[in-house]
Amino acid sequence: KNLNFTDTSAADGTRNGLPSYVTNGQQTFFRYGSAVIADGKRVRIAPQAYYYNGPFGLITEYARVSQDVSKSADGSPAAGGTAVNESIVAGTNKKLKHDAWQIAASYLITGEEASFKGVKPKNDFDLDKGGWGAWELVARYSEINLDKDSFKRANGQYGTDAGASLTAANAGTFAYADLTKSAKSAKTWTAGVNWYLNANAKIALNYEYTTFDGGAITKGSPIATNVNTTGSNVRDRDDEQALLARFQVAF
């Protein structure tokens, strides 16, 4: 019977490139626009709680990333801009806050004690001795919600990526997210099974189903000024289904 709460946080000042977000199937579903750069602090918090009782386990986690960004007429280094960004467009600095959370449950059908530190099978996998290790069923729900201001222009209106390059004159026409690739949110349902061969080796097999809100443009249509809002020509990305297998060895 274990109940524990942990909290980790980190903060750093940066003016480099910005990360993209990908699914477990390695598909990018959110990235910043080519003219957007990190300009200030990035703060991450990730509190976590877990509970174990006999073969049953439950873990939940929340994460928030707060990122200061601006727009540069030189573009982003990661998107082919100059190595040092000097032409920051006035009035485009914004703090974006992205949130994610998950809850996962597990049950050891072979009767072992569940633990945050790992599972020790009653009988290690050994065909000669008739041992089959430990078997665990798992289920998880997770979602991420991107800051709605990511999809707005500097003046607060939903905008387009009009124009070949960003300048002080046309800065208001650029959103902070790459509107051709970025979804407003993603939700994933996962079901799987873990096979613990022994205390140090595990084989995991998971099926994941992910849905998206936004993130795809209707074929043949330009980006609308009311992008990612009701009535726009931006549709949801296709659902993603993934079957993932992993072999893990711990020492």
Positions of predicted regions on the chain:
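Internal, glycine-rich beta/alpha segment that forms the wall or movable "lid"
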Residues: 1
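Outer-membrane beta-barrel pore domains
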Residues: 4-251
